[in-house]
Amino acid sequence: MEKMHSKSVSPVPFNNSNNTSLGGLRKSSSIPTLAVPECESMGNKHIEEERTNNITTMAMKRRLLDPQNKKKQNRFERYSSSNHAQEQSSEENFCRSKKDSTVLKFGIDSILKNKNAEKVPKGISNAGRIQDERFTEACTNTSSNVNPLSKYFKPSSNDQLGARRTATSFSSSSEASDSKSCCTNNNEEARYKYRVIDKRKSADSDWSEDATGNEADDPDDHINQDNCDLASTLEQSRIVALEILKNKRLRLDSSEALNDLTPYDQLSRTEDQQISRRVEMMNHQAFARENNEWPRSFSSGLQDPFAKNLPNAFLPFYMQPYLRAYYNIQKYIYHKKLLNRNDRFYREANVENDNYKTEESLRSPSETKQYSPDASTFYPIRTEDSNGSRNLKVDVEEGDKEANKLFKDLCVSVGDRLSNALSYGRKDYNGLSTSQTSGNRFLNFSDKGIQAGSYYQTGERNDSLAGPLKNSGMSFDFPPKFGSNNSSTDKPEQEDNNPQTIGSEYQINTQRSMKDNLLTAKLLENEAKLRYGNIVTQYPRPFSWPFAASVRKSYDPALRSYFSRFNNSDAPHYGAAQVNPTAGNNFKSMLPGNFENPYFFNELNTLDTTGFLSRQYGHMSSSQNPHSETQNRSEEVRGTVKKRRKWNRAVFSLMQRRGLEKSFQSQKYVAKPERRKLADALSLTDAQVKIWFQNRRMKWRQEIKMKNRGLVPVHILGQDHEIEKEKTQTPSDEGEVINVD
């Protein structure tokens, strides 16, 4: 065996005074580290450079270590910590390049789990740096939650630099069988080197400074021995991740959702756990960058952030819940893979037999290949068109039963909610179906069979949104072409040729178009309520929602088309379809009578000059002749008919009127908080309740004046007749028209 170089300094392992000679990897005498013998192969040049750096460090300490200036202390500590980390990194790289030793990591949990010093793992030797009794006491003292090794590394009171450092783990290096890689100290053979890991060199450490400049206590200074069982910890983390997904408590808006699945936030970490957590956080940061590309509101265009080859994979807006469920599954699968990778890393690092010396385990953690998400990590989304149906295809790993089951449960739960909305107005609703062949899971959502054709035709694919979209049987394109007028504007020119034929076709197309509009409104209402809660009830019109501005910039043509119909002045701003205004007064009779939330569809019933449905179908009446209707519309388009001024009116159902009347009898004036509660209870807006109470108070004052004069109001004389009439009316046909302007 060769001897150590004669110029090397023999360090004292537990002397923490300021005058301790430097040796091995120690950067400063104040750093409470265990000395490391230097390999002879490092050469004199490496030793001289190390001594020069040590002299510089000592000079900086004497110059900056002023008890009255804590900022300089902190600055020196940061400098020394970073320099110390660089020294360790250069030492490891040098030894690895010379193949003198191999770094094998052993967590402190593998040491402390042994009750006796004789049962120390094979890779750890107690013949070198630590006295036998101290090491035995450290290994046997496992009852306390405080690190039993910390008292041997506690610096003196004069040691300002290392006052808050704690020894958390060791690293051992095995000596190769070749005699050239042998190291000695004090003429004794030493096969392993030890060093204390400085926790603050970690990029993810939680050190901070308070207002006085003192550094806060590190929460990970003490190791909880109850959490050393990594296998059970990983299993618990996996169960928690599943529960988070099943209970739908996983947030999707930012990288904070990933913190809910971080398995080591609540654990006191050993060195191996710190290294793995550092790798894990890097993976989470990379995943968060992908997460930022995911649309966080329904105003965003639906893009697949994982499939790099489909940057513009737009999907119908009513399939967004399925995509959210898919996103949950992707996050679960990603975290599960990350846990499996970390579990494999720990298993390779803690095996106590000779079989663990594989190519993977012989690498240091810094050389271990990091698990980072890329396009191949996640299962891509693909859309397929078959016979007019839009199907969503998702690839799932074959044999991953948990992911498949979770995927199916989430999709079915979302499908149940959507089926209630989409089944309105269509009899042959296909709903949700799943199938799996050769590891591919198909989520089939068919929009074929909607009256007046499919919303999304087979010609509308990922990169063809700007192309012409033709829907047979509809009076206008849905969604419309960008920057083009609606196809329904060409109908008046055709009416002069054959008004009888064109009139009947136009009436059929009009009825279909109205059903399509109502179906669209129903879908958007459910989607908005699902995302924004009761915010829809506070705003009477969709374009007055707070997120309407972002919707106008959306890439989803369906949302653009929908919002353009409620506000014609904004239509040119975001490329919506232009329509010719008309007038009318009998749109209400054409609406179905089974609306669950009439407040939302009041805007469709409104005879407003800016309303799409009232402008195009306002003059239509069920009792009118379609020929005369066509003629009136043609004359109006030519400008021969003067437009009438129409008021924005609201129609209240019988239940709403009774609820308002009951509240008015108990209280004539309603405060704003109570008015909002009443509006929410009756599915009305705050403005509608306010205007109703104003009109009702006006009638109430007139009744009082007439009673004072000895007169009986006219509506009281016919009150019994009106009550009988209300009993025979249906909720969709009755209503009180009130001026809300």
Swiss-Prot record:
TM annotation in the entry: none
Biased composition (Low complexity): 7-19, 169-181
DNA-binding region: 645-704
Compositional bias per record (Basic and acidic residues), positions renumbered to this chain: 63-78, 630-639
Cellular compartments annotated: Nucleus
Sorted UniProt keywords: Developmental protein, DNA-binding, Homeobox, Nucleus
MF terms in GO: DNA-binding transcription factor activity, RNA polymerase II-specific; sequence-specific DNA binding
Bias (Polar residues) ranges: 79-92, 363-375, 616-629
GO CC terms: nucleus
UniProt main location, coarse: nucleus
Region of interest (Disordered), residue spans: 1-30, 61-96, 146-183, 203-226, 357-383, 476-501, 616-642, 722-741
Domain of life assignment: Eukaryota
Tissues where the protein occurs: Expressed in the tissues of endodermal origin.
InterPro entries, per the entry: H2.0_Homeobox_TF (IPR052497), HD (IPR001356), HD_metazoa (IPR020479), Homeobox_CS (IPR017970), Homeodomain-like_sf (IPR009057)
Family membership: Belongs to the H2.0 homeobox family.
UniProt-recorded name of the protein: Homeobox protein AHox1
Organism: Halocynthia roretzi (Sea squirt)
Highest classification ranks of the organism: Eukaryota, Metazoa, Chordata, Tunicata, Ascidiacea
